[in-house]
Amino acid sequence: MASTFNPRECKLSKKEGQNYGFFLRIEKDTDGHLVRVIEEGSPAEKAGLLDGDRVLRINGVFVDKEEHAQVVDLVRKSGNSVTLLVLDGDSYEKAVKHQVDLKELDQSPREPALNEKKPDLGMNGGVETCAQPRLCYLVKEGNSFGFSLKTIQGKKGVFLTDITPQGVAMKAGVLADDHLIEVNGENVENASHEEVVEKVTKSGSRIMFLLVDKETARCHSEQKTPFKRETASLKLLPHQPRVVVIKKGSNGYGFYLRAGPEQKGQIIKDIEPGSPAEAAGLKNNDLVVAVNGESVEALDHDGVVEMIRNGGDQTTLLVLDKEADRIYSLARFSPLLYCQSQELPNGSVKEAPAPISAPLEAPGSATTEDVGDHKPKLCRLIKEDDSYGFHLNAIRGQPGSFVKEVQQGGPADKAGLENEDIIIEVNGENVQDEPYDRVVERIKSSGEHVTLLVCGKVAYSYFQAKKIPILSSLADPLVAGPDAKGETEHDSAESTKDSSHPARDRTLSAASHSSSNSEDTVM
């Protein structure tokens, strides 16, 4: 029965600030997410969308049974291009009536017709260049990673399917029908479905996948070339190695190097305030992986010290914090591969931004010195006298909230919050597009302490202009204080949600309950 239904793949592209030119809606007594009111000459019309079409998949993710608000959100967050798999209205209603599994429609790649040419994408000297495999790091939320595993008759390997919209897998960069190459650094290309399921189950709450999308898998299959793990893209990993270039001062570099009793290798300790090490971005408990471009993982303490001394008045260190070390160890990848994939400017600290729900290229025009001058801030506030010591303000009818009237000496002031700081995250959840009341509710429900990711106006404008997502990984990590209740230096709230939103003009009005154009709450 399923073979009698023919969904259509419609690829829509629009310019910045333009609409796709159609309405996506639900209607009473009508199943599915409907396409309506297609504008003449719009991207929707050009892509072949028809009135009454039902949307089955968005960018490969099955959405027919999802909440309508989530489906709309997926389209909006796709940027300036989106791929929709749709079924015409009559066929959809027949499929529902006959209880056809809509997930199974158009699951296998369509073969080109005899008179149809394959697209010449990624061609280099007449040979198609296959895209990179990619590492995806998943941390379970609740009891689910947000995907299912499947095998396809006649195809070798195990594939990922049923990707939950805005779930763990999607946020980590997993795509529908991805071919699974490795689980936690172990190749599973020849493993059975049951063996892969067992490996995933035994992984616990954290797992690392090496994946290729279906087009990349097809490319390698046609060229009969194996996947090379050393070519994998690392940009989706939430914590990355850092390259730190330090120039020696009059009193040396300003840090101690120690062999870690609990952590392997040589660990950075006791960084002196105001020292060259602190200024260069070195952190306590960083693990040293390479010195001046050479791996030191196999050297003892004296050997690493000697290499640093041999650098003269300047040394370059490749370091990992504890979480980055944990991630790369799980993947069984050398951090040196990260260096090989980066173009590092001289005399800078390179910190890669964390991923969002889809791969993002770092803007080529932004130098690391620029980013270092425009950092968001992680602020952990401990309530005093039932107050956080600041007002929250917003422009009525517009998304986004910002800080006003920070009380001197209050919790907000102590945590580093400043007037007109823009709220990006509350306890790791991105709130840039949330209504004012919802942000207030999140902060109030936090109890005695709350962690905010905020950005000053100048830094916010910089990130928006450069199209750099504002993520907590760009901020300096929180340091555990006497009231931190056992949290470690690296226990900071991380968000994988897309926060690359267009800059919004704001009139930063004074906090007032009676203002006609703003909303304000004492926190």
Curated annotation (Swiss-Prot):
This is Na(+)/H(+) exchange regulatory cofactor NHE-RF3. GO terms for molecular function: PDZ domain binding; protein-containing complex binding; protein-membrane adaptor activity; scavenger receptor binding; signaling receptor binding; transporter activator activity. GO terms for biological process: carnitine transmembrane transport; carnitine transport; cholesterol transport; in utero embryonic development; intracellular transport; positive regulation of cation transmembrane transport; positive regulation of protein localization to membrane; positive regulation of protein targeting to membrane. SUPFAM superfamilies: PDZ domain-like. Pfam families: PDZ (PF00595). The keyword Repeat applies. SMART domains: PDZ. It comes from Rattus norvegicus (Rat). Keywords: Cell membrane, Membrane, Phosphoprotein, Repeat. Coiled coil: none annotated. The modification Phosphothreonine is found at T451, T488, T507. The modification Phosphoserine is found at S108, S148, S192, S250, S334, S348, S492, S495, S512, S514, S515, S516, S518. A scaffold protein that connects plasma membrane proteins and regulatory components, regulating their surface expression in epithelial cells apical domains. May be involved in the coordination of a diverse range of regulatory processes for ion transport and second messenger cascades. In complex with NHERF1, may cluster proteins that are functionally dependent in a mutual fashion and modulate the trafficking and the activity of the associated membrane proteins. May play a role in the cellular mechanisms associated with multidrug resistance through its interaction with ABCC2 and PDZK1IP1. Residues 9-90, 128-215, 243-323, 378-458 form the PDZ domain. It comes from the Eukaryota. Interacts with PDZK1IP1 and ABCC2. Binds to the C-terminal region of SLC26A3. Interacts (via PDZ domains 1 and 3) with SCARB1 (C-terminal domain). Forms a heterodimeric complex with NHERF1. Interacts with AKAP2, BCR, CFTR, SLCO1A1, SLC22A12, SLC22A4, SLC22A5, NHERF2 and SLC17A1. Component of a complex, composed of PDZK1, SYNGAP1, KLHL17 and NMDA receptors. Interacts (via PDZ1 domain) directly with KLHL17; the interaction is important for integrity of actin cytoskeleton structures in neurons. Interacts (via C-terminal PDZ domain) with SLC26A6 (via C-terminal domain). It is a peripheral membrane protein. Residues 479-523 are annotated as: Disordered. GO terms for cellular component: apical plasma membrane; brush border; brush border membrane; microvillus membrane; plasma membrane. It is found in: Membrane; Cell membrane. The PDZ 2 and 3 domains seem to be involved in the interaction with SLC26A3. Interaction with the C-terminus of CFTR could be mediated through independent binding of 1, 3 and 4 domains.
